[in-house]
Amino acid sequence: MTTDLDTLLTALYVHIDDRLKTPRWRGRPPRLTDAELVTLAVAQAILGFHCEARWLRFAHAHLHGLFPYLPQRPAYNKRLRAALPLVKRAIRSLAIDTDLWLAPLWIVDSTPVECARSRETVRRSDLAGWANYGYCRSHSRFHWGLKLHLVCTPAGLPVTWALADPKIDERQVLAALIDNEPHLASTRPGLLILADKGYIAAELDHFLAAHGVSLLRPSYRNRGTPHPAEPLLKTVRQLIESVNDTLKGQLDLEQHGGRTIDGVGVRVAQRILAMTCAIWHNRIIGAPTTRSLIAYDH
């Protein structure tokens, strides 16, 4: 493990331990604290371990200097699934702690999160009723699973996100994200959101305008006069694609291995937290590339 990753994990542990302390459990305190648990989960995502058993074998062999106590797989899995609210709070806390948080420009997009392939796995999955069949136009393929709807800044810093049934309209999810946390938009006067053609809807435009938000997306050729800034969309849209590529190509989002609602949720959040942590730390140390994981992934 490199000294760069060692420094990042130490900074993350201190941040969580100082700012996100959870109420103490009844009885004997856990031997692995919540801050250590989240830090261990981030290290797993950055180093690319999909299998928790293999990850814990590696941790027992190489990370005892950072983590005096390391649990076995059942205890780690149980604690990690229960820590989903803490992981979400950590994502938000790190994002707020950067100078990118109040950026008046957001980019929104969705990407599939496959959860099963075989018909038998779909039939027996605990995700039935939450996951569903969907179609990914960019890859021209059907999948069974969920969709990750991510709202981020141009630098890739996650602002808010949601996992949803792939059959749910993207416009409904965006409206729900804004409606669920209206303060995110109200604290950014003149907020502009960039999106693709999937977000075209007069109803969505009216809803966002009521929250003081403007939406810029490509217009259809036969519908009205295009926005003067539309030629810039193609360049800016590549940013969100690169964010999705970071999550899938470097943090292995589609190899999450989750089989339950909590399991999928925390493993997706684990990867978003790892990316957020890298952005946060790179801004602190003045790294030339904000979203680079190269210094930490080996």
Regions found by a protein language model. Give the residues of each.
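Short alpha-helical elements
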Residues: 1-298
